[in-house]
Amino acid sequence: MKYRLVITLLMFMFVGSVGNAQTFRDNNNMQLGIVESDGTVRNANNMRLGKIFEDGTIRDSNNMRLGTIEKDGTIRDKNNMRLGTVSSDGVVRDNNNMRLGTISSDGTIRNNNNMRIGTASGVNAKYAAVLFFFNLF
């Protein structure tokens, strides 16, 4: 009986840990990777690509700084050059204020031509912009 209980608890722990990760997928619904609750970004093969820290710092798997996400939605590269912004309504713009696309509240990612290019289910819109539009990973 104890053995079954332990196995059941382990199963729930595993399901719970996977459930905390948010997925991002391409237009064909193929999983590109996940963003874990602590900001760790992994590809579809579960290889660690890097991490987005609470202060907005983006680092690769070797802990090299790739850029930052500022509180106002400004995305900067490792040299502190402004790459673009993500507004509170999900509109993504480049450094020249040209519209790149949108990230809707349901996680749908659309390019400037309103074509669906992927999804980021449960992923913070700023993180999704880094992953889909600014290619910092």
Residue locations for each model-derived region?
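Long terminal segments
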Residues: 2-32, 36-49, 54-59, 64-66, ...
